[in-house]
From Swiss-Prot:
Alphabetical keyword list: Cytoplasm, Endonuclease, Hydrolase, Manganese, Metal-binding, Nuclease
The protein's name: Ribonuclease HII
Top-level EC class: hydrolase
Source species taxonomy: Bacteria, Bacillati, Bacillota, Bacilli, Bacillales
Co-factor note (free text): Manganese or magnesium. Binds 1 divalent metal ion per monomer in the absence of substrate. May bind a second metal ion after substrate binding.
InterPro entries named among the record's database cross-references: RNase_HII, RNase_HII/HIII, RNase_HII/HIII_dom, RNaseH-like_sf, RNaseH_sf
Amino acid sequence: MQKVTIQEAEHLLQEIISEEDDRFQILIKDERKGVQKLISKWYKQKELAQKEKEKFLEMSKYENALREKGLTYIAGIDEVGRGPLAGPVVTAAVILPEDFYIPGLNDSKKLSEAKRERFYGEIKAKAIAIGVGIVSPQVIDEINIYQATKQAMLDAIANLSCTPEYLLIDAMKLPAPIPQTSIIKGDAKSISISAASIIAKVTRDRMMKELGEKYPAYGFEQHMGYGTKQHLEAIEAHGVLEEHRKSFAPIKDMIKK
């Protein structure tokens, strides 16, 4: 192989997947600083990819154990929006295929918006089934947020295109005739729950951005309904909306004034 430019070396390293590659053996002997920097970057990316693979395998242990028992339709379930002062609580139930793999999958709260959007598209394309449950602020006020979250999860299961054989749920037990395991911080321990958290989060965020367009003075597209200083000041200035949860403090105290 003739001596390549730094740019050519960069393109080659994007193609090379093993140190055994003859081209890599030539590049590693190239003493130019630019090439050595690229080699160092290649090793770091390789190390990161390995860590992501190990993390993914660790997060697949619940699903793999159930598949060993002959189960196929394993639904991960998670919610987003229990804490905000406005907007619905949104849940998702996701059934993934056995060969599903997205490196870097994690709890939706730990991912950037750009990554969540990308993963959302991949999950939608690859999942066996996805169900979403949405419960309004009015119902939350009527039955309380805990019961509303349960209801949204049951709705998400009902909206799946196939019946799950087992449920993996993030920190919740459901009154459903389906075997289930409740996992504390499940969105960081199970790929199915993690996928559900991403579907629920992106779905709810999109709804809150639409509310932001409808009520520009409230900034819903920025705080997603949570009780930030900006949000509380907007309520003081412009009043309580039908999208606000009247049973949540400080909204209920503002109504009493």
